[in-house]
């Protein structure tokens, strides 16, 4: 899934002679805190409401403001992971997309990113989620997949989180099997720590509920 497939057709663009008041009005209407600024088809940067509030005068044209450009966009062939990385690192509600000739192609809304994460992580597919913990030096994706497949299941998605101030990693797996008991038993035999599990049809435990709450807070930024 690449950036060009995530483009929204509702994100307005700003011109340098638009006023801060006009820009804030568009942001309020579309419930975003950033909008791209163009000079013709040339991308000039990404304007935020914080920049305008700090400037003070909402009647001035946005061309008078210092609008950041670096690390505020992705290219149209960028993978969704790169889009997420830019949005997360800069806390963006909108991610502009350019082609390799630096021509503006459109923008991606944060809500569009989140709506596509379920496809990336196979959230809608039936199965179980297993959260493992293991030493970094012992982590092997091949071994993890082998354990799952030994129990006649398949890994649908996998992501790894390096735990801060620790020599361990957390591995979150989505497998295509609801009855994950045998898989858990095998992981335990291989000395993996089972931190969490979730199976379709079961209620989320407290930790999973907290993580879901954090995701919702991120959506509302």
What are these model-predicted stretches?
Residues 1-26, 37-39, 43-46, 57-86, ...:
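Bateman/CBS regulatory modules and CBS-like beta-alpha motifs in cytosolic regions of diverse proteins
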Residues 126-221:
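A conserved regulatory-domain signal marking ACT and ACT-like small-molecule sensing domains
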Residues 33, 45-52, 105-113, 193:
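Short hydrophobic beta-strand motif reused across regulatory alpha/beta modules
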Residues 13, 18-28, 34, 206-214, ...:
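Intrinsically disordered, low-complexity terminal regulatory regions
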């Amino acid at each position: 899934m690449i950036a060009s497939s995530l483009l929204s057709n509702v994100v307005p663009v700003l011109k340098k002679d638009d006023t801060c008041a006009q820009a804030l009005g568009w942001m309020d209407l579309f419930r975003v805190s950033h909008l791209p600024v163009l000079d013709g088809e040339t991308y000039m940067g990404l304007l935020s409401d914080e920049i305008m509030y700090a400037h003070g005068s909402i009647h001035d044209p946005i061309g008078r403001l210092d609008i950041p450009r670096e690390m505020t966009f992705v290219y149209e062939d960028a993978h969704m992971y790169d889009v997420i990385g830019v949005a997360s690192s800069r806390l963006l509600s909108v991610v502009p997309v350019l082609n390799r000739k630096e021509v503006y192609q459109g923008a991606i809304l944060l809500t569009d990113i989140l709506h596509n994460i379920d496809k990336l992580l196979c959230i809608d597919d039936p199965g179980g989620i297993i959260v493992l913990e293991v030493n970094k030096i012992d982590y092997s994706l091949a071994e993890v997949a082998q354990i799952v497949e030994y129990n006649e299941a398949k890994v649908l998605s996998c992501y790894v989180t390096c735990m801060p101030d620790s020599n361990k990693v957390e591995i979150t797996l989505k497998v295509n099997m609801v009855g994950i008991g045998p898989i858990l038993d095998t992981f335990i035999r291989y000395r993996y720590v089972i931190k969490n599990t979730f199976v379709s049809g079961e209620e989320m435990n407290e930790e999973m509920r907290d993580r879901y709450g954090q995701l919702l807070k991120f959506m509302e930024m």
